Amino acid sequence: MKKEERIALISSITHNQVFGEGRRLRYKGETKEFKIFEIPMEALIYNVQNGRIGSLVKTFEHSYGVLDPEKPEDSLTIAKMLYSSNEPANKKTRADIAKCGQMEAGIITADGILVDGNRRASLMWSILNDPDADPNEKARCERFRTVVLPENATQKDILRLETTYQLGTDEKVGYNAIEKYLHARDMEEKGFSIGEIEEYMGETNSSVQELLEVATLIDDYLDNCDCVGLYTRLPKGFEDDLLKLNTAIKKIRKGSISWIPTTRLNKVETDLKAVCFDYIRLNMKKEDGFEFRDILQTSGGNFLQNEDVWNDFVENWQNAVDEVEEESIDAIIDRASGDDLERELNKRDNQWREKVKDSMKDAFKNAKDIIDNQREKEKPNALLRKVINALNGVDLETVYRMTDKTELKEQMKEITRLLEDVNSAIAGNNN
């Protein structure tokens, strides 16, 4: 149904039919009661700007172009996005709607765009199009109970309502972690003040600032791995790591890390972001001996607190990732689509991980060992035990077969020198 047809049908209903009681909404700065109408499902279309699926929509449109909810194929794509955003919860809600019908009224514009109720409407359409659905179940889904906004509702009014009644209050089916960051930035770009975003999203002023800062880091992360606009490429657990990174960046900018001179602030911040982005992408786990906070946040000592440790760590990380070649994202998008695209992008990430993981693990472990050893500097017995254990782990057969032993010889000279220093300290203590 085209826009003009939707407007005419909805208008004819709003002038004649009212269902039940009204719904109170905060609209244009006032709390008003709006009547609820029963609108045929064919008069509705998805809101492609829906905050619940912002990351999926932005990723799709970056790869394939703008989604048009009036087109059946694009409408189906949006429905799949809504369902996949929280499949277990959607499965339960669909069963509830099939049994009891729509329980909560939605909000639509005068031309049928869903402001609040995209998820519910998609499940109702799913039931209507299900050949195995019971006729009574389908009958419960033929009309959508909803408030209809005035014709003069602006895009800003619509975004304000969506934010207030979904991101601000909808805890029944939580949004994915990334959506609130993208939504806050969308609101800022559409002219909402920090105070307005705070009010409509139900956040504090400082939380809104943080949402916008992390939204910028999300884009920086995607740019770092050549995935600009592909928001589905963020790995699970990214949120906590980016929040830690954001806190560390603020410390650098405030000059709170004593060893960093003013002339190096930008360089250290740039290195920190690039390092952290690569370790987020590497997706190391605790069982690998990895703690992201060891890089920048551990209270008892982290890599960023010590100039020598930081410089060595950055150099070792740089050596690990330099010269690693990857297929361009554009080339992958040109030859793959849909589920195939997701598989190819996952394959690209996995290939990168295989190339860098051993060296990046070593870079992390070396820095971690130095920090740990500094904590134990008053415990020489423990440190020497680590040396013994490490030397016992050397495979002498491997050493024998090595053709170039230059680096090993240099390391043995350094070990010998250090042991002589320890022996001198022991002998001196005995005199």
Regions found by a protein language model. Give the residues of each.
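Amphipathic, charge-rich alpha-helical segments that serve as recognition/docking helices
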Residues: 81-82, 129, 138-223
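Short active-site loop/helix that positions an aromatic residue
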Residues: 119-135, 265-297
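Bergerat-fold GHKL/Histidine-kinase-like ATPase
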Residues: 11-18, 250-284
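Short, charged/polar connector segments at secondary-structure boundaries
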Residues: 1-136
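Charged/polar low-complexity intrinsically disordered segments, enriched in acidic residues
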Residues: 331-410
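An acidic, glycine-rich, mixed-charge low-complexity segment common to nucleic-acid enzymes
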Residues: 1-24, 31, 35, 391, ...
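Eukaryote-biased activation of long, low-complexity terminal tails and linkers
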Residues: 283-320
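Intrinsically disordered, low-complexity basic tails/linkers immediately adjacent to helix-turn-helix/homeobox/MYB/SANT
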Residues: 226-263
